[in-house]
From Swiss-Prot:
Residues spanning the signal sequence: none
UniProt protein name: Serine hydroxymethyltransferase
Places the protein is found: Cytoplasm
CC per GO annotation: cytosol
Residues modified to N6-(pyridoxal phosphate)lysine: 229
Gene Ontology molecular function, alphabetical: glycine hydroxymethyltransferase activity; pyridoxal phosphate binding
Amino acid sequence: MLKREMNIADYDADLWRAMEQEVVRQEEHIELIASENYTSPRVMQAQGSQLTNKYAEGYPGKRYYGGCEYVDIVEQLAIDRAKELFGADYANVQPHSGSQANVAVYSALLQPGDTVLGMNLAHGGHLTHGSPVNFSGKLYNIVPYGIDESGKIDYEDMASQAERYKPKMIIGGFSAYSGIVDWAKMREIADSIGAYFFVDMAHVAGLVAAGVYPNPVPHAHVVTTTTHKTLAGPRGGLILARGGDEELYKKLNSSVFPANQGGPLMHVIAGKAVALKEAMEPEFKVYQQQVAKNAKAMVAVFLERGYKVVSGGTDNHLFLLDLVDKNITGKDADAALGRANITVNKNSVPNDPKSPFVTSGVRIGSPAITRRGFKEEESRELAGWMCDVLDNITDEATIERIKQKVLAICARFPVYA
């Protein structure tokens, strides 16, 4: 018999120690990785529930296993909330991740060898949008599009590439682009050659839900997203669509299960349902508005201090620092800021002279600091500290001084009070 008082601390001290150390790290470090966020205790409660025990292959009302009457309710809640939140008439909440959601879309709509137009990884795209080291770059003929000299998406070049190569699919979305994407323009280009227009909005889904960033769902044939990042839910994926194309919806469902996944993770789907409900609350909109304000506040300080920001600013939750002119690598910047308890990630910049393992830039995002309660004042202060570190990247005294400031502000703004 299993006893509810069983716990990790008494049974596996080594594992528990590592888990507790991660809790301390999260509380005592400032998180600026654009794809990371803090989920709510309600989501974590769902993920630690007995739903983890239930196998439920299939979809609500059409399961291959018995005993699914209650997990059917859970999944249907998540589906209905996803559709309502994003203005879709189709939602699949089963993908285990954003990458898995993308796999399902590709395998539903493409054949190996088909031509796909996707954003260049070095210009802000994502691995699953055609990187040669990823399945997408290995299975499909990828034609990249990118940004112009101003740092904005080059729609003229995209249209030219589309006309020349006649891709079966055009991918919108990014992992390191700070501008507003013109979804309608991209759909127009796709329609001009009879291509599918697929959007991966993983990075901006929370902003979209709150009306802070344009919604791609009315424009795309299919949209995917993660449920963490700006949406602040559990780690997982969603597929969305609208337009009433039931044949498309059947293809997408079949591509998720049984083609690419087996049983859904019902405890995670419950977490998605909670997060989607939270995203409908008025305070979530206020939060997302503040995310955008904080990113802009940080950019202003970096520009004042003489740092180059790709595209010159941000219209969402993230931005890229281009450190080429400072003769600092992204790897060294990441390490120095890390010693000051500020977590970022090294990132390639356009025309980067360094390898992807070294890079010449760092990506910075505001969702996690905003979740802690940072406003513009704290965001500007933080950006100033980061400039102090980068201006004195080998000065351990400066790094230690900033670390103490970070510890103090983290104590003032705990992740979980």
